[in-house]
Amino acid sequence: MNRRFVITLYIFFSWITLLAQSGVTPKHEVRAVWLTTIGGLDWPHNYARNQYGIEKQKSELRTLLDLYQRAGINTVLMQTRVRGTTIYPSRLEPWDGCLSGNPGQSPGYDALQFAIDECHKRGMEFHAWVVTIPVGKWNKLGCQRLRRKYPSLIKKIGPDGYMNPEDPRTASYLADICDEITRNYDIDGIHLDYIRYPETWKIRVSRDQGRRNITNIVSAIHNKVKLRKPWVKISCSPIGKFNDLSRYWSHGWNAYTKVCQDAQGWLRNGLMDQLYPMMYFRNDQFFPFAIDWAEQSHGRTVAPGLGIYFLNPREGNWKLSDITRELHVLRQYGLGQAYFRGKFLTDNDQGIYDFVSQFNRYPALVPPIAWSGQPEPQAPSHIDLYKDGMKWDGSTPYYNIYSSRTWPVDTDNPENLIAIRRKGTSLSIQTGNRYFAITGMDRYGKESSARQSHNIPEVKTIDVPLLKCNGTWLTLPPKDKGLDAKLLVVETLQGSVIATRTYQEKFVNVSNIPNGFYVLKSLGRKGVTHRLGFFTVKRNLATEF
């Protein structure tokens, strides 16, 4: 390692320490996770062969999404087209076997629809992850079906089959797959994986022609999806290094030259709304290339994928600091974050889940498609506050709710965000002694101006205040003598249970609950719940690093 690079790293890490102490979190930031379904790697871990199996799959997915939400994740990239197979009822391709245990067989429910609904309940975007060029083992169902339908379209490399990127039918076929998903489901994005030449493909055309071939596929998908639903985001996961840099070599593994991915050109030409470069590297193989993505984003959203699987001793045994340093630099450069893959995040290898939960201690909105040319949506017309809730009038598909003890509520401060991408025009919440503001949000992620609540004098007369919480201990209200509850349940405003506690003492430890606004309920022996109040967990970020 040369002396110049040692000095550069020292400056970087000193700078990162200052960033950690600042505790600044952005209001807009992609925080994504790849949820892998092939072989049930992330989900599901059982087969749906009867109703019990279906419910077990659903319960497992709900648990995963709750964990993602607690870690501040706002975008789920879920593998939807697997290897010429799908996790939804398709007229074009057969069922993947990850759900039922038998390729081609329905699991008895629409897993894609269920996943979308559950993500939206939690205020998270759902992006359908479509594996494009690889279609699996040569004699497996997905590849076999495509070979029978298009005999000359599939090429064999080793034991695997691949769609030929040089055949124009590949572009139209993949566009039809993405159109089918977009037409039939309320997705927020189409996420293209392996949209490139296989590294083992002997490319006999010029690299320029190879890049045109891949770009033609991207363009066909983009045009068909945007014609159907222009607000659906188009993204992909290119190789993590775009090309060799003037001072840093990609070691022969890059998007532009090796596999003909002109990903930065796709941003420049408007074919991509987001990029998730697979940056599973560290130190001088990460930082310069991450900065290159930031500098060549052309105003679009870039969220580098982090190889958190290397934190697992069986995979690479990286140190946690390898990832945390990368996260701080990404945030400083206005880049998002994406985690490969879900299991390694929720398994908390080397404490990564704990760190991310604190790093993303306040909610964040996904950056809007600002280049859509859509007008600013209308703000809600008014807000009515009640003792235990609020209602408002509005015409936008989503709403973001903000709250603080000062007026007007600062809607630029993510600390004040208490609910994001909320559907409907009401919210159950204890409103005492707080001000509220609500913004409307359209399908493109654009926010309206804020409608501020003004009837705080009326709200101050409410006789049930917010519960006191110092960030570590929550003060409980006096327990009614007739209440048989033995447990306390902590929920998000969306209704997701994130913690349970024994209902015995006057105080409850909440030190492991992320910053946020929560509902506290009692749970009786017969499953009856009673709302005891609301509380805010708010800590100083600088003390956590």
Please name every model-derived segment.
Residues Y399-T431:
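Recognizes extended acidic, P/S/T-rich segments that occur
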Residues E125-K137, H191-L192, G210-Y256, T301-L311:
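Aromatic-lined carbohydrate-recognition surfaces of secreted/lumenal glycan-active proteins
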Residues P457-T461, T475-P477, V497, N515-F545:
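C-terminal tail/sorting-segment detector
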Residues H28-V30, W34-S59, H127-N184:
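Active-site-adjacent "subsite" loops/lids of carbohydrate-active enzymes
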Residues A263-Q264, R268-F286, T301-S372:
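Substrate-binding cleft of secreted/luminal carbohydrate-active enzymes
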Residues K56-T85, N184-I187:
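Catalytic domains of carbohydrate-active enzymes, especially glycoside hydrolases
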Residues F355-S395, G445-E458:
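Pro/Thr/Ser/Gly-rich low-complexity, intrinsically disordered linker/stalk tracts
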Residues L427-S448:
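Beta-strand-rich modules
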